Regions:
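Active-site-proximal binding-pocket segments
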Residues: 223-412
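Active-site "lid/cap" and pocket-lining segments within catalytic core domains
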Residues: 1-262, 272, 379-494
Length: 494
């Protein structure tokens, strides 16, 4: 019997482990529900609910082939050990996973168990992230080669099995408390395909122009990111569908928007590659010269104001309240939230990134922690961007539409005052700014720029570049910037 372990790849199409396993014999499609992962500080109920919806559809798709999903609950090694006693399997199939530190440790334990028990664990690449690479040279070319392979068809049928399946624990039994997210995106393959179709036929036309605003980005972005995170849709499927759309007759705007989208699919994998190459960046600074910079100055009151959207800066608060209620925010505004917490409030990126991880339905550890560090200035190799929240508000929401929706306390203010309510004589109950924006920005910039001038910083930065920076541009027909430009940093909107 072949065991296909579904992890964050909840689909039957373009699924190499499933396809290859079926060629070898009867297949047990397995999902191991691991309660311990839900006690980790980056987990939340909105993730759990999206997962359940995706598992329900996966089970239906597999059942239509002849064998539904076998669910087992518990520690992965213990579950596999029990399953081996039941079936005697000698091959385990799965996709490679670049997850959080907990899943990395679990995979190491499974690898050791497989070795000790005569099980061949066959992992296949997903999304174009390269395992075991020691250099970023030719990474873009390799990624394109991988992404332009033909998509893998689902099996024609699966042989029915007599193995028992278990029920999933309830959220409350996992310690997952209430999570008020009325605007959360729904999980499952059908929703992913509907979003992809809507993006490629209607919403994506103004993607390149409108992605930077939280008002327009909500509509024009693909909104596929949680489906990439849980694997209900593959990056290859989205990329090839976008290219096919570009080959068809198009109205003005489509060409540039679809090329921008395709570029961001590559950057999606580029950032996950950073965590694959250096799992420690989830926990420690990418550039060691920043160790100790913020660790001893965490202000709990500032963190609370930031996390609850009551900083006194309307655009910051509107963005935080929006992502809390919907699980999604366009990328520029995510970067602004992180930057404001790290620079203006001088909070360490670890705690603030965990809070955002719990809020983002599309939480992807590889992108998340690399970006958290970029917006906090601790990579040492990227442009230091300290957002002015008032300017961003005026640029991205000039008429105050987004502000009035999410910060109703100031909805009565005229447009010329809504971005700076502290200047209004009747701002009501909305709080005053918790910091002096100009002063806080200057202090943060001075601290980091002085550190960047040191010889030690420059030496370590060279090491970081060699390990993590993008190198060459991709082949000409897929050309986009091979450098980590400021634009690429902030425009991963999917």
């Amino acid at each position: 019997m072949e065991i296909v372990w579904f992890k964050r790849d909840l689909r039957i199409i373009d699924h190499a482990p499933l396809f290859e396993a079926v060629e070898c014999g009867a297949v047990c499609p397995l999902y191991i529900f691991e309660p311990d992962i839900w006690s980790q500080p980056d987990a939340s109920r909105r993730h759990y609910e999206f997962l359940l919806e995706s598992l329900t559809e996966l089970d239906a798709a597999l059942s239509a082939l002849g064998q539904g999903l076998i669910i087992r609950v518990g520690d992965a090694v213990e579950v596999l050990d029990t399953l081996k006693a039941e079936t005697g399997f000698t091959r385990l199939w799965s996709h490679q996973e670049t997850g959080n530190g907990w899943s990395y440790a679990r995979d190491l334990a499974v690898k050791e168990w497989a070795r000790a028990n005569g099980v061949s664990w066959k992992e296949r690449k997903q999304h174009g992230v390269m395992r075991g690479t020691h250099s970023r040279d030719k990474w873009a070319s390799n990624w394109h080669r991988e992404m332009y392979q033909p998509q893998i068809s689902p099996p024609v049928q699966l042989k029915p099995l007599s193995l028992p399946s278990r029920n999933l624990p309830a959220a409350a039994d996992l310690g997952l408390g209430p999570d008020d997210c009325p605007g959360r995106q729904k999980g499952g393959r059908r929703e992913a395909m509907s979003l992809l179709d809507g993006f490629l036929t209607e919403r994506g036309q103004t993607y390149r122009r409108d992605m930077s605003s939280p008002l327009t980005g909500e509509w024009t972005c693909s909104r596929l990111s949680p489906h990439f995170s849980f694997g209900t849709l593959s990056i290859r499927e989205a990329l090839q569908a976008s290219e096919a759309r570009r080959r068809a007759p198009m109205e003005k705007g489509w060409e540039g928007s679809l090329r921008a989208f395709e570029s961001r699919l590559r950057w999606h994998c580029h950032f996950i590659q950073k965590l694959e190459d250096e799992p420690e960046i989830e926990f420690r600074n990418m550039h060691a010269a920043y160790d100790g910079l913020r660790e001893d100055s965490f202000d709990a009151a500032r963190f609370t104001a930031w996390s609850e959207g009551i900083t006194g800066f309307p655009f910051i608060d509107a963005c935080m309240r929006s992502v809390t209620a919907t699980g999604w925010l366009n990328f520029r505004m995510r970067a602004m939230l992180m930057s404001f917490a790290s620079y203006h409030l001088w909070l360490h990126w670890r705690e603030t990134s965990l809070h955002l991880a719990r809020l983002f339905t599309d939480y992807e550890p590889g992108i998340h922690y690399a970006q958290a560090q970029m917006q906090s200035g601790t990579t040492g190799i990227n442009t230091m961007r300290i957002y002015n929240p008032v300017k961003q508000s005026q640029d991205q929401d000039p008429d105050g539409v987004f502000l009035r929706k999410w910060v109703p306390e100031i909805a009565h203010l005229p447009t010329h005052l809504i971005h700076t309510p502290w200047a209004a004589p009747d701002k009501g109950q909305y709080p005053d700014p918790i910091i002096n924006e100009h002063r806080a920005r200057k202090i943060a910039a001075d601290r980091l720029y002085s550190l960047r001038k040191t010889t030690t910083h420059k030496r370590i930065a060279g090491e970081v570049v060699r390990k993590h920076a993008s190198r060459a541009a991709p082949p000409r027909r897929h050309r986009s910037s091979g450098k980590e430009t400021a634009s690429a940093q902030f425009e991963l909107d999917l």
